[in-house]
């Protein structure tokens, strides 16, 4: 009898792809705190998962019923939609019932990936997110903040930065509650901020001088290349700053409110908490 119960519980396992990333880590922590079994889908996971090696996919789907689906490095890169399609087909053939996709606002390729889920026959939920607040503290922008000068090709366009904790809360709700099936949530924060204003709020929270310098996309791409960053990363960042940040996403949405029944976390609250945790200390 115990074996039957254990097997039933194993079949409720949720696969968290990108489980060591900004949102995946938080999703995994929340599911674990609820006593729900998870499997981390990453190159260091057991079994390992690698988007570039389809042979690793099937073992991670064994005895899984739901998947939190993130694509690395981004759904905008060439080949992402084909990979998502192949994975979703395998997931459905493996008996997966629920798929929750992390997507991006204003990205045509991401919307094509969303359509794959919508056509899959699974209980799907799509989280179409604005820029993460945590990009300033858990990404390559942390070092510029610590150095006191943030250089980016972003002008006077407002962005409704969303907190990764809000994204994780919505993702967990979608993975564990039936009412989110078939929902597309656009997730934003409660305010529009330019990147210069966001850096200013971080400066205020830390009590330090942190300057913001705007450069051209060409200058920025050249600087990234000189820093020996991968060409794919340079292309992606330039794409996001020149295409996604062209004003198309400079508006607020009510996705967090609809999904969770509460307001999203403000960028200033994120900045204060992150500063207090010492993340930006030199």
Please provide the spans of the model-predicted regions:
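Mobile cap/lid helix-loop segments that border enzyme active or cofactor-binding sites
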Residues: 211-277
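Periplasmic-binding protein-like
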Residues: 68-70
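Short arginine-rich
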Residues: 281
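Oxidoreductase cofactor-interface core, primarily capturing Rossmann-like NAD(P)-dependent enzymes
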Residues: 2-39, 43, 49-55, 62-65, ...
């Amino acid at each position: 009898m115990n074996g039957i119960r254990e097997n039933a519980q194993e079949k409720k396992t949720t696969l968290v792809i990108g489980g060591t990333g900004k949102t995946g880590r938080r999703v995994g922590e929340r599911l674990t705190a609820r006593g729900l079994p998870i499997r981390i889908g990453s190159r260091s996971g057991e079994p390992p998962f690698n988007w570039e090696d389809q042979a690793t996919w099937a073992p991670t789907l064994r005895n899984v019923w739901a998947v939190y689906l993130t694509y690395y490095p981004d759904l905008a890169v060439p080949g992402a939609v084909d990979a998502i399609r192949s994975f979703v087909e395998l997931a459905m053939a493996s008996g997966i019932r629920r798929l929750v996709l992390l997507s991006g606002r204003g990205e045509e390729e991401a919307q094509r990936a969303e359509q794959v889920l919508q056509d899959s026959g699974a209980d799907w939920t799509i989280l179409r997110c604005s820029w993460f607040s945590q990009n300033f503290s858990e990404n390559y922008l942390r070092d510029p903040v610590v150095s006191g000068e943030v250089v980016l090709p972003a002008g006077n366009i407002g962005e409704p930065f969303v907190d990764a904790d809000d994204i994780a809360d919505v993702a967990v709700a979608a993975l564990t509650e039936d009412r989110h099936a078939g929902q597309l949530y656009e997730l934003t924060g409660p305010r529009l901020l330019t990147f210069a204003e966001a850096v200013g709020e971080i400066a205020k929270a830390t009590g330090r001088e942190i300057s913001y310098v705007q450069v051209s996309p060409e200058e920025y791409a050249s600087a990234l290349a000189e820093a020996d960053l991968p060409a794919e990363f340079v292309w992606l960042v330039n794409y996001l700053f020149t295409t996604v940040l062209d004003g198309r996403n400079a508006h607020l949405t009510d996705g967090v409110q609809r999904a969770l029944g509460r307001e999203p976390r403000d960028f200033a609250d994120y900045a204060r908490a992150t500063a207090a945790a010492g993340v930006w200390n030199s």
